[in-house]
Structures are given as C-alpha cells and as structure tokens.
Amino acid sequence: TIPESSYGEFKNAPLTFIKNRFSPYQMVRENEDQKFDSFEVYFNTDNGYVAAKYDEEGDLLSTFQRFNDVKLPEKAKEKIMQKMGGDTQILSAKMTAVSDGWKITKEIYRVDVRSNGQTEKVKLIKEGDRYSL
C-alpha cells in the first residue's frame, strides 16, 4: 500500500512513481534461487491500484491501472464538451489504463456527466494522442 504522504505523486504519475521508488532488480536478486518467468507487483491506494508485470530479469513488461475519482485531462474535457454541449457538468471520472513496458498504450475514462438536467455515463477512450467517445 502506498503511504498517504506519497499518494499525490503516485496518483498523478503512477509509472514515474514506480520507476523512481521500486527496484524490481532487488526483488530478482533476493529470489534468485526461485524459478520464475515473470512476476507481478501490486501498488495499492484507497483510490486505485497498478498491477505491474516484470520479466525474470526485472524489466517491466506491462501494467494495468485502475483509479477512481481522477481529474480528466483538458483534451478529454474538451472532447466531452464538444459532444454533449457547453452546459455539461463533469461529476466524476474513473480511469483504466494499460501499458506496454513504460509506455501507456490505452486509457479508458468512465465519466459521469450532467447535461440538460440529465445524468449519464460517458465512455472516453484515449489511444496515442486521440480521444474518442
């Protein structure tokens, strides 16, 4: 579990946090008598988690991230406003992301919005620099 004092850093840039604060190579050294092809490490907070998969040498293979109550990137907000109209209010957002090594390949946002007095859920997908609803 990530300490509360480090939570903001982890939530804002989870892969950077993991890269700077976790040594998979130490784990490999400490378990060199074990036979394994890969291993997973889970980084948890009250608001979400990252599951990181490493190979037998300690190199990052992939991650799966899920966070609640995230702040949407500006481009994501703009895409929602374009689609739903200017009176749209963003109520909350959840984010799921996957990476190939250290590179995020896909982000999925599930957003609760209020527009024209109605509350609805919007799914927004980011692949590369492109957002789609």
Regions found by a protein language model. Name each.
Residues 76-80, 89-90, 101-103, 124-131:
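Low-complexity, flexible helical/coil segments
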